Design a protein with these regions (language model features):
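Chromatin/DNA-recognition segments of nuclear transcriptional regulators
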Residues: 57-70, 79
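N-terminal Rossmann-like dinucleotide/flavin-binding domain of flavoprotein oxidoreductases
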Residues: 73-98
Length: 425
């Protein structure tokens, strides 16, 4: 009995020592210079690092990390991060929340009690929102707090789409669901009390990809697309921002080349054994690359006044015939890679949010440049203290960041002035 108790005490003490050392390591880990509120962000990064290690271990023992129990675990963890804690009372009395089904797809609606539409517009101005999570993780429920805050701040009705996710439902399932819901809203605007002339599509990360793709398909009906840290292309993984985050492991739990490449592979239903080909930019034919390489010419398309990087895109120079025929077809599909739509002159007005600490930074900036070049009205806001996913901390949860609140304030001002045509201070 005494030996057993002693062993238990030794194990307990050992765990305390290990935990204390781990906390010490996290607290003293170097953070990227220039990142505001780093003491909060280091813990977001650590959560992602732990998930990454766990995913690696599961992969090593042959467990598919996209299985439903793992999704539930990840979604629960991020739900705690994004939403109020149980003992907090964050009440939006001016927002009505409902669940519904539009054309077979589950949605959650967040409707302000007071309608902010201009007098000549019947129904609510409406944001159709597509959540992020690499087309694999997260859900509308995880985003509940931020979505309530978005509706409360903007005074727009928000319709959040619970689209199908990979690997169970790869491309084009998520796109089809988002398109179906947006079409349904357009076709049933009167009965849904939606102002048909003020329909906005929006999303962050993978959701930004879906918003851009839907905006292209329904350009005649979309008034504005809001792209927040969007994933827009898998042609080249050596843009300056990808290089920046390959050269130094900055915030790998939040954003990293390996993480984004894996997301694209799951969405595209590409065998993960080919990951090394994508990491080496050998996954597409040189013919296809030549057709679109100008869209990724950082010397031409990155706004020089922003000074986001001193690097240039390293263009593809090799190809592997094992995967390139299949991936070429994906690249050519604007539903999958909206960045490579040949004619973008018809695209709706665009509001783009980019972050300095994000591997996806440069593709959004270069896409914005090409839209401007083709006569599209573009409003670009780059946040030097922002990171991938930072916009979700603008309010609605127990953690709020100043840079996120600034981004929300600027978006609200734009919507009021340019979309609703309201007088602003």
């Amino acid at each position: 009995m005494g030996r057993t108790l002693g062993a238990v005490i030794c194990v307990f003490v050992g765990l305390i020592v290990c935990l204390s050392f781990h906390v010490y390591t996290v607290l003293h880990r170097a953070m990227p210079p220039g990142l505001a509120e780093a003491e909060k962000i280091r813990w977001f990064d650590e959560l992602g690092r732990l998930a990454r290690r766990g995913s690696g271990l599961m992969h090593d023992v042959g467990i598919n990390i996209g299985i439903q129990p793992m999704k539930i675990f990840i979604n629960t963890a991020f739900s705690i991060l994004f939403n109020p804690l149980p003992w907090q009372r964050v009440v939006y009395r001016n927002i009505r929340v409902n669940q519904d089904v539009y054309d077979g797809v589950t949605v959650s609606t967040y409707t302000p009690v007071k309608n902010s539409s201009p007098p000549n517009c019947q129904g609510y101005p409406t944001i159709v929102y597509f959540h992020g999570g690499g087309w694999t993780w997260l859900s509308v429920g995880v985003y509940d707090g931020p979505l309530k805050n978005l509706a409360n701040k903007t005074k727009f009705k928000v319709v959040a789409v619970e689209y199908r996710t990979a690997p169970q439902d790869p491309f084009p399932a998520a796109y089809d669901d988002c398109l179906a819901v947006t079409k349904y809203i357009v076709q049933h605007s009167k009965e849904l009390n939606v102002c048909k002339d003020l329909i906005v599509v929006a999303g962050d990360g993978a959701g930004g990809n879906l918003a851009a793709a839907v905006a292209i398909e329904l350009s005649s009906f979309v008034r504005l697309q809001i792209l927040i840290n969007p994933a827009l292309q898998m042609l080249n993984f050596a843009t300056p921002s990808y290089q920046d985050f390959s050269d130094m492991e900055m915030l790998p739990g939040i954003t990293s080349p390996e993480k984004e490449i894996t997301n694209w592979m799951r969405y595209g239903n590409i065998n993960l054994s080919f990951k090394h080909l994508l990491q080496g930019n050998r996954h597409v034919s040189l013919e296809s690359y030549a057709a679109f390489s100008d869209f990724l010419n950082s010397s031409k398309r990155l706004p020089s006044p922003l000074k986001v990087s001193n690097k240039s895109t390293i263009h593809n120079s090799e190809s592997n015939d094992t995967v390139s025929p299949f991936i070429d077809n994906l690249i050519l599909d604007s539903r999958f890679n909206p960045m490579f739509t040949q004619d973008v002159s018809f695209v709706a007005d665009t509001y783009i949010i980019t972050s300095q600490f994000d591997v996806l930074r440069d593709e959004a900036l270069m896409f914005g440049h090409r839209l401007l070049e083709n006569g599209v009205k573009v409003e670009l806001h780059h946040y030097y203290h922002g990171f991938h996913g930072f916009f979700l901390f603008a309010g609605g949860g127990w953690i709020e960041l100043k840079e996120s609140q600034k981004a929300m304030e600027q978006l609200v001002n734009y919507l009021n002035k340019e979309i609703l045509r309201l007088k602003t201070n």
